[in-house]
């Protein structure tokens, strides 16, 4: 034993002074004094359990004593009757054995390889004993889990990382994966559970028994994140589920982790052999796999970035030339050649390194240098952790702990130890760089690209600093990191194949660099991640965005500008194709071309396939709306033109729907016989409201009224003949059905037919004569107001002319001014009372006083009031052109007409853009004050005077 340095002798005196009065200080051997001066953990443990000192004196720790761990622990567990007792005994046994291991290590009673073995066997012994005790307890409670043949099913535990390799460090987490062989249910218990439930509950209890801190401490911190799907996945998986996961979507890092996986406990049973055989093809490829080098280089780069980012200076595990680089060197050969060289299929590092040397895979002497460095670094790591039973690999800055490590490593002082350490780490770094290559980026561009890869691939936390985000304020930086972290968690729940992950890893750094160059980075990122979540399992779409940078830029621009567009793209990723050509993306279809475009689009789909026809109609609408929204966002379409395009689009779709419905009806019932000697179909669709007024918005419904001119006695001429008027009723019902059927792309439009004669109580389709009679004799004033904004949007020229004549006759009917004024005003007040002000501290752009509805009521009132003298007022159905007509016919002065037109288009523009933002149509109470004053003044002038 090396004598204590003066500094440690002085520290021992401090330790002795604080020992309890009844502590047998005088009886302590020089060895005991040295170890207690070295390790606070040992000091505190023997103060709490003085009897352990006697055991150490009577039975000094030995290299082979790990062989007795199982028997010693089982002896202590015999008297345990409940989980609390189990947890206490596990903790005390672990602490006592760790004191013995620390004692032997500090005094160099055992070699470093033997210390690693003791630490690993101790952990395995505790894990298996806890599992077996809890398995028996759970079987008593719920019965024994069995497969379909009644064979009992065990819980198998894969120890990962250093635990699996038999190289556990002194104070370490344990990485575990739980599995059970076959599905089935429990038998013989008070109530039956399926095996998944049983093993999940058992797994939860096992983690609690090992991990939960009590007054006796904890056994091990348990990390289950290496299991399939990580924290998002089931706690325990069946063999079949494990096999499916690793075959379909096992990632490179999971393959590397599985190299060291070892089944805890019985390694020779049939189920253990089955599990090993199942995992082997995933880990060791039959061919030489050089792609491993780049993957490991990427992983090493990620670790190096973490070291830099977190300021992990003097880290003997993760730093340059540290333990992790030795592990990487060994894994490169295991993963490249392990499938062909059984000698490389070992879990422990040192035997594998010896096999690498025997196979001459490293230059002469390098394996010897790596072995020496590994043992040096592992001893230093374990000594460092045994000081306080603390999981750390960072060298101390204080003089006391530096003196402790110098003594434990048999060097005279810290400077000597530092020089030895630097020499070992330099040797490791040289071998690593020669084999895997230095990952340091050379040029500024390469460095920047590295930062974006870091941002995506490293599990950055909100407090981490990334150079890529240095230009963002703290709140935005945290938001971006949180969004990326949430997206990564969501990905863990998805089934993504290796190709999909590869493309995603190529795409994301580019996407993040584009988004994070914007001042509003969190906004587009929050809108795009739901889209990406929806397409990660569809590699074609990921490749589209990865291979077409222009499409990616347009996606970010549109999503940043509009959550409506982002939501639409997320729901219907087929629309991503529309981003490929910027020349067409921001250019909506020409005004007269929507029908032709749709006709061409539908030619791709078999005419007889109704389902595909419906889907194609919806896809066409969504694609065209995306083009309109893109032009709207880009500012190339003013508000009037946006509504025009949305209206033309709706008319083209209505035309196609009527054609489809007509074809289906004629195929089923034949043609109404009154059509034999004439052109056309004797059918018309009247658009009311926003459709009639050329004022559709992005989410507007369609107000429709259906007319026909079929005489009462007409029948159809098909094999299943029906009454002609019944034919038109079923035609209208079919049209409504085609609009409202929900496919994977949603519905076409919401359709409202309640503006027909007698409303919801009336016939869905009426004759033109019945419509005229109703309007003349039964309709209310508000129905005549609605007629102002009505026009035929589909129909025979003759029927259209008939409707136009009816509309003109009704609108030009002389009316008594005061009565009309009262009726219009009362209707407006009823609307206000019915709708109510749902946002008392906001201005509802459409419904509140001074808003859009007031303007509409003003124009409708003026048409009804003056059209008898000025029939030209009935020419148009949209408010803007009606206001022009009012000025041209000297009813309203031009200044007022212009002011109302400005107010109307301004308010409608605001509604359009709120819709693009998926925001409700109300704004701050002081907004649009000038426009509202104008509308209120006109209301006062025309309807209150």
From Swiss-Prot:
Family annotation (SUPFAM superfamilies): Nucleotidyltransferase, Nucleotidyltransferase substrate binding subunit/domain
GO molecular function: [glutamate-ammonia-ligase] adenylyltransferase activity; [glutamine synthetase]-adenylyl-L-tyrosine phosphorylase activity; ATP binding; magnesium ion binding
Organism of origin: Klebsiella pneumoniae subsp. pneumoniae (strain ATCC 700721 / MGH 78578)
UniProt GO BP: regulation of glutamine family amino acid metabolic process
One GO CC term on file: cytosol
Entry keyword Transferase: yes
Pfam families assigned to the protein according to its UniProt record, in alphabetical order: GlnD_UR_UTase, GlnE
Gene giving rise to this polypeptide: glnE
Name assigned to this protein: Bifunctional glutamine synthetase adenylyltransferase/adenylyl-removing enzyme
């Amino acid at each position: 034993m090396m004598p204590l340095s003066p500094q440690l002798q002085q520290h021992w005196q401090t330790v002795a002074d604080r020992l309890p009065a009844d502590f047998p200080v005088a009886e302590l051997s020089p060895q005991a004094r040295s170890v207690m001066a070295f390790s606070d953990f040992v000091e505190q443990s023997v103060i709490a359990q003085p009897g352990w000192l006697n055991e150490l004196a009577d039975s000094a720790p030995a290299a082979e004593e790990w062989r007795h761990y199982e028997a010693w622990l089982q002896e202590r567990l015999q008297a345990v009757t409940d989980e609390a007792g189990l947890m206490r005994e596990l903790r005390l046994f672990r602490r006592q054995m760790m004191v013995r291991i620390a004692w032997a290590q500090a005094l160099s009673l055992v070699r470093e390889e033997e210390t690693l073995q003791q630490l690993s066997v101790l952990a395995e012994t505790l894990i298996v004993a806890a599992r077996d005790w809890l398995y028996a307890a759970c079987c008593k409670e719920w019965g024994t889990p069995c497969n379909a043949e009644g064979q009992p099913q065990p819980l198998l535990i894969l120890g990962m990382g250093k635990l699996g390799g038999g190289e556990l460090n002194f104070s370490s987490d344990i990485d575990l994966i739980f599995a059970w062989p076959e599905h089935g249910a429990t038998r013989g218990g008070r109530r039956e559970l399926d095996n998944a439930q049983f093993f999940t509950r058992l797994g939860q209890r096992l983690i609690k028994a090992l991990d939960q801190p009590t007054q006796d401490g904890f056994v091990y911190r348990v990390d289950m994140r290496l299991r399939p799907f990580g924290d998002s996945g089931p706690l325990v998986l069946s063999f079949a589920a494990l096999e499916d996961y690793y075959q379909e979507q096992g990632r490179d890092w999971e393959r590397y982790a599985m190299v060291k996986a070892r089944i805890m406990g019985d390694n020779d049973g049939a189920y253990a052999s089955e599990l090993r055989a199942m995992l082997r093809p995933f880990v060791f490829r039959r061919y030489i796999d050089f792609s491993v080098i780049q993957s490991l280089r990427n992983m090493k780069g990620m670790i190096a970035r973490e070291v830099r980012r977190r300021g992990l200076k003097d880290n003997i595990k993760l730093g340059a030339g540290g333990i992790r680089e030795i592990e990487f060197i060994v894994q490169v050969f295991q993963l490249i050649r392990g499938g062909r060289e059984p000698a490389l299929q070992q879990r422990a590092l040192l035997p594998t390194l010896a096999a690498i040397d025997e196979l001459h895979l490293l230059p002469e002497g390098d394996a010897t240098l790596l072995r020496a460095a590994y043992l040096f670094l592992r001893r230093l790591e374990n000594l460092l952790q045994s000081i306080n039973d603390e999981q750390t690999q960072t060298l101390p800055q204080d003089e006391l702990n530096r003196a402790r490590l110098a003594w434990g490593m048999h060097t005279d002082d810290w400077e000597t130890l530092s020089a030895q350490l630097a020499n070992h780490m330099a040797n490791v770094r040289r071998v690593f760089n020669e084999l895997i290559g230095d990952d340091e980026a050379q040029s500024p561009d390469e460095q920047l690209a590295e930062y974006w890869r870091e941002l995506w691939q490293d599990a950055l936390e909100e407090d981490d600093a990334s150079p890529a985000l240095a230009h963002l304020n703290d709140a935005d930086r945290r938001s971006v990191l949180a969004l990326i972290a949430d997206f990564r968690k969501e990905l863990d729940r998805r089934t993504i194949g290796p190709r999909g992950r590869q493309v995603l890893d190529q795409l994301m750094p580019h996407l993040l660099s584009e988004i994070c160059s914007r001042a509003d980075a969190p906004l587009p990122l929050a809108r795009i991640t739901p889209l990406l979540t929806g397409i990660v399992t569809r590699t074609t779409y990921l490749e589209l965005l990865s291979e077409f940078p222009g499409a990616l830029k347009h996606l970010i621009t549109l999503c940043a500008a509009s959550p409506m567009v982002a939501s639409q793209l997320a729901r219907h990723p087929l629309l991503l194709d529309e981003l490929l050509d910027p020349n067409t993306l921001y250019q909506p279809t020409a005004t007269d071309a929507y029908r032709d475009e749709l006709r061409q689009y539908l030619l791709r789909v078999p005419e007889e396939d109704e389902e595909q026809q419906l889907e194609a109609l919806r896809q066409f609408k969504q694609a065209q709306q995306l083009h309109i929204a893109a032009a709207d966002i880009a500012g190339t379409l003013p508000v009037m033109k946006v509504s025009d395009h949305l209206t033309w689009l709706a008319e083209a779709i209505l035309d196609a729907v009527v054609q489809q419905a007509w074809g289906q009806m004629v195929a089923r019932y034949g043609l109404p016989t009154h059509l034999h000697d004439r052109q056309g179909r004797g059918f018309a669709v009247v658009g009311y409201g926003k459709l009639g007024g050329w004022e559709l918005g992005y989410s507007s419904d369609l107000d429709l009224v259906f007319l026909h001119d079929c005489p009462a006695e007409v029948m159809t001429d098909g094999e299943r003949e029906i009454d002609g008027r019944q034919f038109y009723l079923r035609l209208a019902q079919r049209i409504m059905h085609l609009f409202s059927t929900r496919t994977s792309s949603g519905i076409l439009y919401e359709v409202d037919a309640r503006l027909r004669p007698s409303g919801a109580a009336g016939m869905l389709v009426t004759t033109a004569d019945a419509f005229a009679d109703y309007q003349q004799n039964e309709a209310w004033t508000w129905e005549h107001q609605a007629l102002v904004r009505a026009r035929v949007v589909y129909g025979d020229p003759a029927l259209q002319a008939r409707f136009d004549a009816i509309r003109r006759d009704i609108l030009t009917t002389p009316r008594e001014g005061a009565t009309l004024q009262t009726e219009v005003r009362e209707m407006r007040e009823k609307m206000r009372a019915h709708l109510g002000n749902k946002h008392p501290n906001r201005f509802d752009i459409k419904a509140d006083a001074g808003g859009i509805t007031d303007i509409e009521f003003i124009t409708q009132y003026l048409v009804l009031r003056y059209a008898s003298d000025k029939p030209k007022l009935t020419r148009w159905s949209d408010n803007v052109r009606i206001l022009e007509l009012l000025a041209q016919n000297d009813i309203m002065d031009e200044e007022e007409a212009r002011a109302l037109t400005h107010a109307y288009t301004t308010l409608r523009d605001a509604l359009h853009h709120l819709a693009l933002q998926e925001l409700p149509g109300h704004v701050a109470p002081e907004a649009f004050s000038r426009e509202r004053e104008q509308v209120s003044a006109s209301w006062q002038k025309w309807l209150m005077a």
